């Protein structure tokens, strides 16, 4: 038995020990090529026997290789056989025949062999994936890992790395055991495992922490990969699965995936004309498709061998639908042509199940986004919500949310992937901010760059009117969507609601500053708060939407401070006491003024909207109606405002705009919206008339002998109540009784400059809305019914009511009716849009009556 395992070789066992992998320089001990232990790292070689120390002796190697096992006699006696020829020493002494019987013994696999085999299989699969994605050539499979790592590092350095002296304390140990030069790191460099790293840690060195973040990001970027199958579908490497729908096609789903055609494709000449309208008027600002690629597939579609992919079928029908819609909006064709657009959309919707359940290609994402853009021009936003969410989820499966520097894509394809993702991102964040629903895309789990500012195909660029420059509107809209995302996440998310007063005020100031910087980066020709000078119809619509979105975002930021009443004495005291950790943005003190000014500017944009029942109206209808509610709340709060009369006229502009949309019985939702907005306008007019009468009455009382304070006001209230009840039907609305007078904070407001909407509130004789309870008949649960009438964001303007009127001269305090907002914060954050509310108010809508008789 002692002879077993003393030597291994072809003479003894018939095979050599396998070379498992590239041999490393031994550090703590290893095994030689023959499988014997190498003990160069051990301090006392005398602990081993002579045979184990004589590995380098050729004669001894030959003898040891010859003794695969002891002779038969020595094995029988269980003594050590020296293996001498022709007889061993023991056989000579015992005078017996020395016979070596060769017995084939199958050795058990060494411990860990299955684990190593598994690693080899996994490595082989990884190499095959890398070859499929183009990251690894056929010869790279034989390349040493250290060489491959060095090649990747050199490639990243040539792409823009910085000097190696930026990280002098970091070294990497190559496989040959020689220390290398200090390794340079960059944003895209290959992360190295440090064998002899500096004792500095991230906790003690901010620089090392930053380097670590860059390395992790670089590693994440390099680990991303795409794999394209034989059908042309591209999958993100993180989504690879053997159980694909393309292999699992049970018969029960055959009819679900059947392609139903509601309207055949038009002739080629007509189709080319429609496609030209799409790319000239829509895709130039919203680059959903790459025109050369799309037109190549169009030529193939009208050939004998068309491309049969469901993503392409949906895409071509979506483009036809949008093209017909554009012609109807431009009055180039009759309104009846819109029916063709809907039929082509139905063609695309016919493969919706297949797009979401089976496909993983870019065309499917583009088709879903195109359907969402088309359906935004409808009263019901629910389909658009679903389609955008599906498009973003599908974009994750093909890696659109990642930078993709290692995907091996050509610049044109990489740019188009960025454009498609940013379109989905913009739609997602716009839905999020307007509806209060959480976004689908997490900003912390994406690193794709913005679209190019000056792309070769000139997509997104708009020439300036002086002819000396151009402006990329698409990239600007992408930047704006990032700000929208921050506004929701930092002000309206569940986590944001837990902020302290100081954190909330600072957040409002920071977001306002970022929004203003974005606005100032826009050329004067297209900048919000400036006159629109464009003459091209489709371009005007894009600019109008840009301005509407800016004013809405500005209001969404500042209404948070109005909602909490921070712009009253609470805000002033907070700043005076020095509770803020850093200086506040001065515009925080002007939140209410900014909201009302933005509402006025939004209504003034109505003149640029195409008149008539066009689909684009539903896209922007939210903005003017929300602005009307903002002005309505301001008039209720400040009826003596110098611009109150002009604000009522602006409300009338919105009412007239809605009246032009009511063309048939199918627009029931617009009719209900028109009824509510018209009633708001009428109530605002009543409030202003009452305020003027009260002001004149108080002036007369000051001029004449002093009378009891309560008698005239009571008489006036009674008479006004009777007059109002007899003139016309009124909306059953009145402020809740808890909005009583409390003038305690008025003096501090006057002292600290936290004024109301305009300086006209210092006029004597300012009346409160609580005094007008007779003018507007009482209604139980007013605040609850009010929230049922309006969508969450449309009601946000009503939060402008926290500013109390300043105290008038004398000892008569002016009542402060709206110390609390109309709507609690959790109500106007409900996941609904104003369009959805207006369309589904048949059961919640209050009945307009004359109120209770007196």
Swiss-Prot record:
Organism domain of life: Eukaryota
GO biological process: DNA-templated transcription; positive regulation of transcription by RNA polymerase II
Membrane-spanning ranges: 616-636
Subcellular location: Nucleus; Membrane
Keyword rRNA processing in record: no
GO cellular component labels: membrane; nucleus
Pfam families, A to Z: Fungal_trans, Zn_clus
Topology term for the membrane: Single-pass membrane protein
PANTHER family: ABC-TRANSPORTER-REGULATING TRANSCRIPTION FACTOR, TRANSCRIPTION FACTOR PDR1
Function as written in the Swiss-Prot or TrEMBL entry: Transcription factor that regulates expression of the genes related to resistance to azole compounds, including clotrimazole and miconazole.
Name of the protein in question: ABC-transporter-regulating transcription factor
UniProt lineage: Eukaryota, Fungi, Dikarya, Ascomycota, Pezizomycotina
């Amino acid at each position: 038995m002692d002879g077993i395992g003393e030597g291994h070789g072809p003479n003894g066992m018939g095979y050599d020990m396998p070379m498992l992998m590239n041999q490393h320089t031994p550090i703590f001990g290893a095994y030689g090529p023959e499988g014997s232990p190498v003990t160069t790292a051990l301090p006392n070689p005398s602990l081993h026997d002579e045979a184990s120390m004589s590995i380098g002796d050729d004669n001894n190697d030959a003898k040891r290789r010859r003794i695969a096992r002891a002779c038969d006699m020595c094995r029988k006696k269980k003594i050590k056989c020296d293996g001498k020829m022709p007889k061993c020493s023991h056989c000579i002494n015992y005078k017996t025949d020395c016979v070596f019987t060769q017995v084939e013994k199958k050795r058990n696999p060494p411990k860990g062999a299955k684990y190593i085999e598994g690693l080899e299989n996994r490595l082989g699969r990884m190499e095959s994936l890398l070859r499929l994605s183009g990251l690894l050539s056929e010869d790279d499979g034989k390349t040493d890992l250290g060489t491959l790592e060095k090649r990747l590092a050199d490639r990243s350095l040539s792409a823009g790395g910085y000097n190696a002296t930026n990280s002098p304390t970091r070294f990497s140990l190559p496989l040959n055991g020689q220390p290398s030069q200090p390794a340079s790191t960059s944003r895209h460099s290959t992360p190295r495992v440090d064998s002899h790293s500096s004792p500095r840690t991230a906790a003690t060195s901010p620089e090392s922490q930053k380097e670590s973040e860059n390395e992790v990001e670089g590693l994440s970027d390099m680990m991303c990969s795409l794999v394209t199958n034989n059908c042309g579908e591209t999958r993100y490497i993180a989504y690879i699965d053997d159980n694909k729908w393309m292999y699992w096609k049970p018969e029960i789903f055959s009819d679900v995936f059947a392609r139903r055609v509601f309207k055949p494709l038009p002739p080629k000449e007509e189709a080319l004309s429609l496609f030209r309208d799409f790319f000239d008027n829509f895709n130039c600002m919203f680059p959903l498709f790459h025109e050369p690629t799309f037109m190549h597939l169009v030529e193939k579609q009208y050939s004998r061998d068309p491309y049969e992919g469901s993503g392409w079928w949906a895409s071509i029908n979506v483009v036809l639908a949008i093209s017909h819609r554009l012609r109807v909006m431009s009055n180039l064709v009759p309104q009846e042509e819109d029916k063709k657009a809907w039929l082509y959309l139905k063609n695309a919707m016919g493969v919706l199940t297949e797009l979401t359940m089976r496909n993983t290609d870019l065309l499917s994402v583009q088709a879903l986004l195109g359907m969402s853009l088309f359906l935004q021009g409808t009263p019901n936003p629910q389909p658009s919500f679903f389609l955008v969410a599906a498009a973003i989820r599908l974009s994750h499966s093909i890696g659109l949310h990642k930078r993709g520097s290692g995907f091996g894509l050509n610049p044109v394809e990489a740019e188009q992937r960025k454009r498609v993702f940013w379109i989905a991102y913009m739609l997602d964040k716009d839905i999020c901010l307007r509806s209060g629903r959480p976004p689908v895309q997490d900003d912390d789990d994406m690193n794709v760059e913005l679209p190019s500012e000056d792309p070769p195909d000139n997509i997104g660029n708009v020439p300036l009117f002086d002819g000396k420059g151009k402006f990329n509107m698409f990239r600007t809209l992408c930047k704006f969507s990032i700000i929208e995302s921050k506004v929701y996440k930092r002000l309206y998310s569940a986590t944001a609601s837990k902020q302290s007063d100081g954190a909330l005020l600072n957040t409002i100031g920071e977001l306002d500053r970022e929004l203003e910087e974005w606005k100032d980066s826009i050329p004067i020709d297209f900048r919000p708060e400036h006159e629109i000078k464009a003459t091209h119809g489709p371009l005007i619509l894009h600019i109008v939407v840009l301005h509407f979105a800016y004013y809405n975002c500005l209001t969404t930021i500042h209404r948070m401070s109005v909602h909490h009443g921070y712009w009253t004495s609470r805000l002033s005291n907070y700043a005076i006491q020095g509770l803020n950790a850093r200086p506040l943005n001065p515009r925080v003190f002007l939140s209410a003024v900014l909201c009302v000014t933005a509402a006025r500017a939004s209504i003034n944009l109505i003149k640029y909207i195409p008149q008539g029942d066009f689909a684009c109206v539903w896209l922007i209808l939210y903005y003017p109606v929300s602005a009307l509610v903002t002005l309505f709340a301001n008039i209720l709060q400040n009826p003596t405002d110098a611009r109150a009369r002009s604000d009522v006229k602006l409300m009338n502009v919105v009412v007239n705009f809605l009246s032009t949309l009511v063309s048939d019985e199918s627009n029931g939702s617009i009719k209900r919206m028109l009824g509510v907005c018209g009633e708001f306008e009428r109530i605002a007019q009543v409030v202003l008339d009452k305020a003027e009468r009260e002001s004149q009455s108080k002036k007369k009382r000051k001029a004449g002998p002093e009378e009891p304070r309560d008698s005239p006001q009571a008489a006036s209230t009674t008479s006004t109540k009777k007059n109002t009840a007899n003139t016309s039907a009124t909306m059953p609305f009145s402020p809740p009784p808890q909005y009583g007078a409390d003038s305690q904070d008025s003096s501090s407001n006057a002292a600290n400059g936290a004024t109301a909407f305009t300086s006209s509130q210092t006029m004597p004789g300012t009346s409160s809305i609580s005094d007008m309870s007779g003018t507007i008949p009482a209604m139980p649960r007013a605040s609850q019914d009010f929230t049922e009438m309006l969508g969450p964001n449309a009601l946000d303007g009503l939060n402008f009511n926290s500013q109390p009127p300043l105290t008038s001269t004398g000892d008569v305090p002016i009542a402060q009716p709206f110390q609390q907002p109309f709507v609690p914060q959790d109500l106007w954050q409900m996941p609904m849009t104003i369009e959805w509310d207006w369309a589904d108010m048949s059961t919640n809508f209050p009945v307009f009556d004359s109120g209770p008789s007196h």
